[in-house]
C-alpha cells in the first residue's frame, strides 16, 4: 500500500469509551492542516459496544467508494480498517479493532502501528475519553516544532470536564516550559497528555531503555525520555477537554489504587534519576512524601497521613489544604 507522506500520526488508545469516543473522533476530523495526518485508533477489545460506535462513525464519514484508498484486512490480533475522510482530504483513519484485550495481559500495542507511525515526523496523543476543541491544534504545534528545533515537544492548556457533575473549567496546572530536571522532580509536565505533540525521532532507543518495567502509566516516562536533550513548550491557549472520570487510568475510587499509582510515579522518577541525575533523588523523595501525605488526606486516611507527615515540613499553605480537604469530606 502506498500511503501519503504523513507528517503527523495521532495515537488514540481506547477501551470501553463508547460514550465518549465520538467526541474524540470529531476532534480529529475537524483538524485543518497543510499536511496529511493519520489517526491510529486502537480499540483494546472493548465490551461496551465501542467498536460498533467507531465502525459506524468511520462508515458514515470516510470514503469507501470504488477507487478510494480504503481497505479492510484481518490479522492474527485485529481487524483493521484504513480510509480517507470524505471532505477533510488531509485526514486519514487507521482503526485497529483488537480481538483480545492487551492491557490485561500487559501486551504492548504500539508495534502494531509501525506501518503508519514510522513514516511520520511527529506524534500527537489523545485517548478515547478526551477530545480536542480547536481546529488548528495540529497545525500550530507542527509550526512551532518546525521553527524551534531545540524543543522536542509541546502541549497546551486544557479544560477539565468532571464527569460526575458535568462541570467544565479551565485547568489551573503548573505549566513547566523548561527542562528534564524540573519535570523529573515535579513528577509531570503540568498539563494533560491529550494536549501533547512530540518529535518521534527522539524516541529512538526508548523501548530498550525502559526494558521490562511495569509502570502504571505510559506518558510520564515517555516525557522524561523525550526531554533528556530537549525542552517542552506549553501554549497558553486551552486546546482540549480532559475528562475526569470517577475511575480511569489515573483517577481512582480506592485509596489503594491511587497510592499504587503515586508509587509508580516515584519508581519512574528514581529510574530516570539513577540513569541521568542522581542529585535529584533527595528532592524526589521529599516531594513523594508530600504527595503521599496529600493523597492520604484526600481519601480521609488519617493514620497514613500522619505517618507521611513525619517526613514533611508542614507550611501554612499545607494547613490551608488540610482544612479544605477536611471541609470537602465533611460535605
PLM regions with names:
Residues 6-9, 38, 221:
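Cell-envelope/extracellular polymer assembly enzymes that use nucleotide-activated donors
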Residues 17-30, 52:
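Short, well-formed alpha-helical segments that are part of the catalytic scaffolds
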Residues 29-96:
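Acidic donor-binding segment of Leloir-type glycosyltransferases
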Residues 77-79, 90, 94, 99-115, ...:
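A short, glycine-/small-residue-rich helix N-cap motif at loop->alpha-helix starts
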Residues 120-129:
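Short beta-strand-to-loop acidic/aromatic patch adjacent to the donor-nucleotide binding site
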Residues 136-169:
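Conserved donor NDP-sugar-binding/catalytic core segment of glycosyltransferases
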Residues 156, 171-256:
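Conserved nucleotide-sugar donor-binding catalytic segment
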Residues 215, 242-245, 252-280, 302-314:
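Catalytic core of nucleotide-sugar-dependent glycosyltransferases
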